[in-house]
Structure formats: structure tokens, C-alpha cells
Swiss-Prot record:
Record gene name: OXR1
Cellular component annotations (GO), alphabetically ordered: mitochondrion; nucleus
Name of the protein: Oxidation resistance protein 1
Cell compartments where the protein resides: Mitochondrion
TM helices/strands, residue ranges: none
Described function: May be involved in protection from oxidative damage.
Domain of life: Eukaryota
Matches recorded under PANTHER family: MUSTARD, ISOFORM V (PTHR23354:SF62), NUCLEOLAR PROTEIN 7/ESTROGEN RECEPTOR COACTIVATOR-RELATED (PTHR23354)
Location of the TLDc domain: 63-237
Main subcellular location: mitochondrion
GO BP terms: protein retention in Golgi apparatus; protein-containing complex disassembly; response to oxidative stress
Family: Belongs to the OXR1 family.
Alphabetized UniProt keyword annotations: Mitochondrion
Amino acid sequence: MDGWRSRFKRLHRTLSVGEEQCTPAIKLNSPDATLQTEACAPEDEGGLPPVQLCGYLSSTRDRLLTAELCAELRPLMPSRIQLYTKWCLLYSLEQHGASLHSLYEHVRPEEPAKARVGYLLIMRDRRGGLFGAYANEPFRPTESRRYSGNGECFLWSADLHPMLRLRAYPYTGLNEFCIYCTSGFLSMGAGSGHYGLWCDEGLVHGVSERSPTFGNDALSREGPRFHIVALEVWRVG
């Protein structure tokens, strides 16, 4: 755990946007013209190869994940997850419709995973705020009061202008309320009547307040209550 926590010593990292120009390699690999885009992010300090982003349609206008954001989020993930170079878009509000049920259906693994993978949640609010969460397992509804997830989970928010600045909120160990999903909402982080990140079944309204689980500030620029403009879930690995 100490080794994992050391990755969060630098929670404010900066990256100049647009310093390196590149032409994505595009492969049409399905009847619905799904694109595979090879992100031209430079190798990070650990010498990891660049990430390949797969799943955006050619018609998709709202694309939340960029090579620059990948480069900032990747070092915060578990070491074994950092080694993966293929990140796949499982759910997009624009591509699949605004429905939590649809999100669960698209995120659900088709077969048992042969190796552990990670899941990245990204949201954007009406003021352009970009934020989300990393989860060690897929989001799936439960009717019990049992939380899931472990200490690998974290919340994050990002400022895009004038340069990309990422702020991450790692697991504090104060409680085990990492992930809790039902048919009516999805949430990460909780305690004392507050959710670190919460969204409703229509993926229209969200809540982000300080939670003991992650010790986070409100992630949205709109404040504790926000409107969801765009949302994506990615599988890392």
C-alpha cells in the first residue's frame, strides 16, 4: 500500500496541451465504423509505450479522453494496469444514450476476465468541468447494501486551460465505501451522508461532495450539485 500511495505524492501535475502534434492511426474494424485511434502520447517517466484509445465512432463529437489526460491518469493506476496499452470505450452517453441501465449493460464483461483490468469514469458538467473516478472492477447494480471496490480506487478532477492540471484523491482507508451501484444510481465514496461522486439513473443529474472514503473536494465546477453533459466509461486493459 505504501508503494501505491507514493504515486499520489504529486497530485498537481501539469502538462502543456498541444506541444506535440500527431496524426492518429485509424482502423475501421467493425460494420458500425468504430474507430481505433492510436494516441500519440509520448512515453512517460517510466518508459511506458503510448496508449491506444479504441471505441469512438467517426461521428462522435464529444470525446472526453485525450492522450494528454491518459498520460496524467496512468501513473496513478496500479503498476500492473499501467502496463496495458489498449484502453477501450465501453460506454458513451453520446453513442449509447443517457441511461444508467445502458451503462451497466455495456460495461458488464462478456466473459470472465483472464487478467485484472481497470475502469475509468469520465464526466463533464455544464461549466466544462472534467472529472471522474478510477475503479478496480466494473460498475454493476446490487440490491444489497454491500459496497465493492478496494483501495486502488480514486477520484480525480482536471483543469484543461491554460494547461492540463490534474488533481487526484486516493483512498484514505477511513471506510470501505468505494463503489456502490443500484438500478437507481451509481456512486463512489460515501460517509456522513455525503457521496464523493453520484449520478442518477437518467445520467442527467449528479452530486459530488467531500467524502471520508477519498477526502475529496467537490469535483464539479458547478458545486455539489451538477448537470451531466457528457459521460464515458473506459476499460483499461
